């Protein structure tokens, strides 16, 4: 059924039934003829149609077995009240052509609802299309930014040309990650003191950096991360360990996840104790030391082979004398005023991962680094030597118990240091 598209508000739908055969012109004529003068001049159908307030009347009828049935559709631009009056007037029609007829209003539909439905549906289509275009545009922008960041900020560092952040050369503390994408992701959130090992084999550059910097090892939360931790602990000096959430990689972490992981990084001593790796690490250290000594011994033999075979009898005598001396040799007494004595003590504590508190020359107590802070809180002393990192918390506790000097293997992130306490790292003794 074709409906005038210019209708504005309502569609009056009336059902007609006649007891004889009629045609469309008969129906239209009956509508105009039998309602003329019924509703006054204001609602006269002819005038309303001329003024455009009533659209073209559409008639759909079908004749069967001597009866005619069908529908009449009248588009109305009138308001609800006027449209209802006009619809009621149609039901007064009792004859169409020569036949008796009955007219019944089935509905008065608000066509604006249909319009709104079409508007909503079309708006959804347009929004979806706009969203797809916007998404591709935003993805393009993100990719461009990533490329620019990578191009301008990632540098190649060391003889192995390792991917690193621009602050790697000047930072006292560094973050060691696995690959280039990890460095890029941290750069994206403003973390610039990073360097990548590019695999599980630790490069010489990273080993050398670990000797003079505070090192945080930041690895993926998978088996690959475990392997990198083990490798780094064997050949480099790691201070803290941070891990991505289980099953995730550093390169895919959000800013919030990165900050949380770095905030709750674990001191290496605590990590070793928690994971039962202390004995394993000692075994690695012993093996590495032995290999180094053997390598140095071989180099010495190659440099002076002629002296090794000279006067074997004299060598035996010397060895015998040295053996006698070794039996009588004792550990030198600790002297807090001697840098050599302090360095010797610090080396011992580093190897055993312990902390020792002194009052003058006397030892007040020696404890594992992992739980030493809680142990010394109730003690008193004037000198503290730790085989671990001098942290802000350790410094605060030491100051509170009267310590005047702290010696440690490394100095961590100290933001507040009292003027009357001395803080010294291994390489400054």
From Swiss-Prot:
<keyword id="KW-0639">Primosome</keyword>
<dbReference type="GO" id="GO:0046872">
    <property type="term" value="F:metal ion binding"/>
</dbReference>
<dbReference type="InterPro" id="IPR050219">
    <property type="entry name" value="DnaG_primase"/>
</dbReference>
<keyword id="KW-0271">Exosome</keyword>
<feature type="domain" description="Toprim">
    <location>
        <begin position="172"/>
        <end position="246"/>
    </location>
</feature>
<keyword id="KW-0479">Metal-binding</keyword>
<keyword id="KW-0804">Transcription</keyword>
<protein>
    <recommendedName>
        <fullName>DNA primase DnaG</fullName>
        <ecNumber>2.7.7.101</ecNumber>
    </recommendedName>
</protein>
<dbReference type="InterPro" id="IPR020607">
    <property type="entry name" value="Primase_DnaG_arc"/>
</dbReference>
<feature type="region of interest" description="Disordered">
    <location>
        <begin position="287"/>
        <end position="322"/>
    </location>
</feature>
<dbReference type="GO" id="GO:0003899">
    <property type="term" value="F:DNA-directed RNA polymerase activity"/>
</dbReference>
<dbReference type="GO" id="GO:0008143">
    <property type="term" value="F:poly(A) binding"/>
</dbReference>
<dbReference type="GO" id="GO:0006269">
    <property type="term" value="P:DNA replication, synthesis of primer"/>
</dbReference>
<feature type="binding site">
    <location>
        <position position="220"/>
    </location>
    <ligand>
        <name>Mg(2+) 2</name>
    </ligand>
</feature>
<dbReference type="GO" id="GO:0000428">
    <property type="term" value="C:DNA-directed RNA polymerase complex"/>
</dbReference>
<keyword id="KW-0460">Magnesium</keyword>
<dbReference type="GO" id="GO:0000178">
    <property type="term" value="C:exosome (RNase complex)"/>
</dbReference>
<keyword id="KW-0808">Transferase</keyword>
<dbReference type="InterPro" id="IPR034154">
    <property type="entry name" value="TOPRIM_DnaG/twinkle"/>
</dbReference>
<keyword id="KW-0240">DNA-directed RNA polymerase</keyword>
<comment type="similarity">
    <text>Belongs to the archaeal DnaG primase family.</text>
</comment>
<dbReference type="InterPro" id="IPR006171">
    <property type="entry name" value="TOPRIM_dom"/>
</dbReference>
<dbReference type="GO" id="GO:1990077">
    <property type="term" value="C:primosome complex"/>
</dbReference>
<dbReference type="GO" id="GO:0005737">
    <property type="term" value="C:cytoplasm"/>
</dbReference>
<feature type="binding site">
    <location>
        <position position="178"/>
    </location>
    <ligand>
        <name>Mg(2+) 1</name>
    </ligand>
</feature>
<keyword id="KW-0235">DNA replication</keyword>
<feature type="binding site">
    <location>
        <position position="220"/>
    </location>
    <ligand>
        <name>Mg(2+) 1</name>
    </ligand>
</feature>
<dbReference type="Pfam" id="PF13662">
    <property type="entry name" value="Toprim_4"/>
</dbReference>
<feature type="binding site">
    <location>
        <position position="222"/>
    </location>
    <ligand>
        <name>Mg(2+) 2</name>
    </ligand>
</feature>
<comment type="subunit">
    <text>Forms a ternary complex with MCM helicase and DNA. Component of the archaeal exosome complex.</text>
</comment>
<keyword id="KW-0548">Nucleotidyltransferase</keyword>
<comment type="function">
    <text>RNA polymerase that catalyzes the synthesis of short RNA molecules used as primers for DNA polymerase during DNA replication. Also part of the exosome, which is a complex involved in RNA degradation. Acts as a poly(A)-binding protein that enhances the interaction between heteromeric, adenine-rich transcripts and the exosome.</text>
</comment>
């Amino acid at each position: 059924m074709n409906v005038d598209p210019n209708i504005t508000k309502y569609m009056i739908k009336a059902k007609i039934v006649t007891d004889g055969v009629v045609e469309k012109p008969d129906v239209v004529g009956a509508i105009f003829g039998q309602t003329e003068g019924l509703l006054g001049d204001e609602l006269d159908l002819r005038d309303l149609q001329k003024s455009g307030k009533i659209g073209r009347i559409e008639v759909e009828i079908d004749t069967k077995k001597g009866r005619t049935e069908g529908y009449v559709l009248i588009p109305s631009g009138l308001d609800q009240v006027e449209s209802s009056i006009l619809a009621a007037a149609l039901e007064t029609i009792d004859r169409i052509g020569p036949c008796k007829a009955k007219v019944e209003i089935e509905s008065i539909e608000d066509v604006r609802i249909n319009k709104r439905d079409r508007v909503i549906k079309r708006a959804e289509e347009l929004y979806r299309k706009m969203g797809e275009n916007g998404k591709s545009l935003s993805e393009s922008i993100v990719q461009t930014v990533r490329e620019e960041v990578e191009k301008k900020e990632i540098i190649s560092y060391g003889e192995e040309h390792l991917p690193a952040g621009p602050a790697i050369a000047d930072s006292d503390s560094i973050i060691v990650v696995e690959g280039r994408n990890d460095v890029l992701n941290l750069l994206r959130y403003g973390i610039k003191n990073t360097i990548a090992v590019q695999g599980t084999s630790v490069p010489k550059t990273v080993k050398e950096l670990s000797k003079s910097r505070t090192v945080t090892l930041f690895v993926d939360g998978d088996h690959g991360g475990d392997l990198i931790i083990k490798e780094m602990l064997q050949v480099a000096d790691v201070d803290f360990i941070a891990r991505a959430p289980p099953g995730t990689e550093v390169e895919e972490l959000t800013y919030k996840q990165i900050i949380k992981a770095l905030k709750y990084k674990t001191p290496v001593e605590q990590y070793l104790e928690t994971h039962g790796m202390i004995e394993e690490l000692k075994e690695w250290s012993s093996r590495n030391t032995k290999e180094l000594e053997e390598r140095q011994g071989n180099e010495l033999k190659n440099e002076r082979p002629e002296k090794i075979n000279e006067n074997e009898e004299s060598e035996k005598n010397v060895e015998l004398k040295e053996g006698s001396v070794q039996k009588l040799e004792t550990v030198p007494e600790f002297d807090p005023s001697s840098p050599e004595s302090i360095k010797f003590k610090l080396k011992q504590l580093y190897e055993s991962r312990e902390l020792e508190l002194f009052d003058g020359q006397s030892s007040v107590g020696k404890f594992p680094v992992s739980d030493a802070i809680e142990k010394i809180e109730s003690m008193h002393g004037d000198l503290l030597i730790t085989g671990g990192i001098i942290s802000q918390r350790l410094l605060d506790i030491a100051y509170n118990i009267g310590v005047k000097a702290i010696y440690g293997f490394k100095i961590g992130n100290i933001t507040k240091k009292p003027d009357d306490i001395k803080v010294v790292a291994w390489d400054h003794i």
